[in-house]
């Protein structure tokens, strides 16, 4: 609550935030997948009448917290940036692109404690200590062989459709 109260007054929720994962991490999002996700989520924001913001971890703490406090939805790969969802208002949609196999789901527990609407989207995932990729329909989880443009765009579009449906419900 102290973090939420530090952003006064409570801002109007009008943003879809893409919490991009840094490229220096072992579990990075490939440039092609990142571009597909950003384009699909930007479109989802426009369809939902929301402002689209890409989280920048180079900003000051206050600049990083502000978009999360105004978010209707936050989408991002498993990583520290999703911890900024502690600034989100109850009911905010939090969509995590997971690391598989799941060992512990910190963000689901955090979302439950904060009253956020948590969703896991396993169609875009990372194997433990590997890059995030689009999932192959025949594989249990992410398969590097399917990291082509069509698969990336289809997976990103599917994610965007799920986000729009959840926002509208």
Regions found by a protein language model. Give the residues of each.
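The feature primarily captures lumenal catalytic ectodomains
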Residues: 1-169
